[in-house]
Regions:
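Membrane-embedded transmembrane alpha-helical bundles that form the catalytic cores
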Residues: 1-509
Length: 510
């Protein structure tokens, strides 16, 4: 199924959806979602069904234990109530932990077995990695934890819960949805603005097919070459191309599926917010893969930072290092834990683990030094408030992020270190030629224009201008001209051929 076929499937399903009575539209969406999944990953169907069923049953069991405990409390004497509450909570915790271990364990076995075997030099087994398993597992476990924490009641209808887990646009590469944000929308959807939805889909296709897939040969030429082939200058060009390719590939795919969801009147969670305009690494991660960051914040960072062991450690640190250090310590340790897990989420290999730790340690040091930064900013208020300093912070963050991208893209951590070392030790600027980068002069010009257009639209968005909303509000002839012209441009300028399909999304098999 090509990207255009995916878009066409979305339009066809939306047409059937809106032709049906409102009360059965969710059934149409469920059938469309399972039809899509079966067509793309039939062998993976039992796994998504298993996650759906076990999560649904576990959430109901947690609710029943809570209801039973409340009934017993009403009839119990005062001195026994505390014990009854504690017993009910222990049973709920046991159910929750069993479901977490089962589903995350299944994900770990399927996703990391070959990586772990590689540590010991064993050959890969090639286990099946079901479509979207990371995304639907995290989404389902978030729902389970919310039910356990009493945020909302569980969904009693298995089919309706199955729709939440399997909603087909977000299965490809997210975003990771929250049940309380999607429940009502999946039941009936909201207002549909077809021009806005189409423009978002078109923009996603343009980012993916015109920019990301055109930058891909440059990235491959640099990072997939034998070690020592290129000097540091080519490494810099390669990582800059990768920063463009990865952003346009991932955010382009998100825009496409978010546009498809809007055809049903469903608004998916924002997953990217112009990350390369970030002024710090923390700001970057609040703009990049927002739904994963929010998941980690709510279900890992806060529970860890507020846990009793960390609180005791913070109190112990207060006496030796001061109150400011003690206050920042839980956040520092939490960031290291979260980004270690984010690194492993990408893969259990040295490059991903070090990439996660690189980000986590920088954020940890930033948290610990925050009081000093604050005092420095107060002393240099005029400088830090200037436009030039803002630009400096954006460029500094971009450099920090791109250093991390070396670990993300290289095959091993050692390769990443060697490539970065070559930037200073062996630049070899003469190697930077289009023929070495595997891209023609015409493709280079198209890529440059595409990146400039992306930068212009992003800059407008950063300044509060809604380009899509502005275009969708134009007169009908202008809207049609933009949509038709954009479609023709993507058809003419998009990269076509074998290997350039939705399967080539970087995050397709996460």
């Amino acid at each position: 199924m090509s990207l255009f076929m995916l878009a066409a499937y979305g339009f066809a399903c939306a047409a059937v959806y809106h032709l049906c009575p409102a009360k059965i539209r969710w059934v149409v969406l469920l059938l469309a979602s399972y039809g899509f999944y079966a067509s793309r990953s039939l062998a993976g169907l039992p796994f998504i069904l298993a996650t759906t069923g076990t999560t649904w049953l576990a959430a109901l069991a947690i609710a029943r234990i809570g209801e039973s405990g409340k009934a017993r409390l009403k009839a119990a004497e005062k001195e026994r109530k505390k014990a009854i509450r504690a017993a009910a909570r222990r049973r709920q915790r046991a159910v929750m932990l069993a479901a977490l271990l089962l589903n995350f364990g299944l994900l770990a076995v399927l996703k990391y077995t070959d990586d772990v075997r590689g540590w010991f030099g064993a050959s890969p087994l090639g286990l099946l990695l079901p479509l979207g398993i990371s995304f639907y597992t995290f989404q389902s476990m978030g729902y389970l934890l919310d039910v356990y924490n009493g945020k909302y009641a569980p969904q009693r209808n298995l089919a309706r819960f199955a729709l939440f887990v399997s909603f087909f646009p977000q299965l490809i590469q997210g975003p990771i949805g929250r049940y309380d944000q999607l429940e009502k929308q999946l039941e009936g959807g909201g207002q549909v603005d077809v021009p806005r939805a189409f423009l978002l889909m078109l923009w996603g296709l343009a980012k993916k097919m015109v920019i990301a897939d055109r930058a891909l040969p440059m990235v491959s030429a640099v990072f997939d070459a034998p070690g020592g082939t290129w000097g540091g200058a080519m490494a810099v060009v390669g990582v800059l191309a990768y920063s463009v390719q990865q952003y346009c590939d991932f955010s382009g795919g998100i825009d496409l599926v978010a546009g498809i969801a809007e055809l049903f009147g469903i608004r998916l969670a924002e997953n990217f917010r112009r990350p390369y305009f970030a002024v710090s690494l923390g700001d970057f991660w609040r703009r990049w893969h927002i739904s994963l960051g929010a998941w980690m914040r709510d279900y890992v960072f806060y529970p860890f930072a507020l846990s009793r062991p960390v609180s005791r450690l913070s109190k112990a640190a207060k006496g030796r290092f001061g109150a400011a250090f003690a206050r920042a310590l839980p956040a520092a340790l939490g960031n290291i834990l979260v980004f270690a897990l984010v690194g492993v989420w990408h893969g259990a290999t040295s490059n991903y683990i070090l990439w996660g730790l690189y980000n986590g340690v920088i954020l940890a040091v930033t948290a610990l030094l925050e009081p000093r930064y604050k005092r420095l900013n107060e002393r240099c208020a005029r400088l830090t408030a200037s436009r030039g300093f803002h630009v400096f912070r954006v460029l500094r963050t971009f450099v920090i992020v791109n250093i991390g991208w070396f670990f993300d893209r290289c095959a091993t951590a050692g390769d990443a270190v060697r490539m970065m070392g070559g930037v200073f030790a062996r630049p070899e600027w003469a190697q930077v030629r289009l023929d070495n980068l595997g891209i023609s002069p015409l493709d280079a010009r198209i890529l440059a224009v595409g990146v400039l257009l992306l930068a212009a639209v992003s800059l407008l968005g950063e300044n509060g201008k809604d380009v899509r909303g502005w275009l969708a509000a134009r007169a009908l002839p202008i809207r049609w001209a933009v949509m038709l012209g954009g479609t023709i441009a993507v058809l003419l300028l998009g990269v076509w051929g074998s290997g350039f399909s939705e399967a080539s999304f970087i995050y397709f098999n996460f």
